[in-house]
Amino acid sequence: KYATIAATPEEADVIVLKFGTPFTPVEDPKFFLERIFHQGRLDFPEAKKREMLKLINTKPTISIFTMNRPAVIPEINTGSSALIVDFECQDEILAELIFGKFNPTGKLPIEMPSSVKAVEDQLEDVPHDSKDPLYQFGFGLEYQKNNN
């Protein structure tokens, strides 16, 4: 509907990667909420991160993160040509966004930390206090309008 899907990254003009927020699986949850909400690490394991960065460094890349909590992704952010954060929207909406079918607007309802250390050092009961966040609470961009 929008583009031709390439068989390999080498054949692609642009790579679109979609990820969920990293988390640590709980094998035997003791509490009801552990069955529903992700917890644990906010960064990807090194092997997974290397795999992602290898693709990102191959071609221009649009990285899409479906988030249910903040993620520590500075290397992915730096390597990506574009970074899109969504909160459980449909893939068709993301395709329409990428192909310019509408002018997106939105603001982050969370702060995106710049490192695991920044997460560890921040206070649990104080909002928006991490050191040098990758993206601050309320950050948002939109496409520039074409007046032609």
Q: Which functions belong to the PLM regions below?
A:
Residues K1-N148:
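C-terminal non-catalytic regions of proteins with extracellular/luminal or membrane-system context
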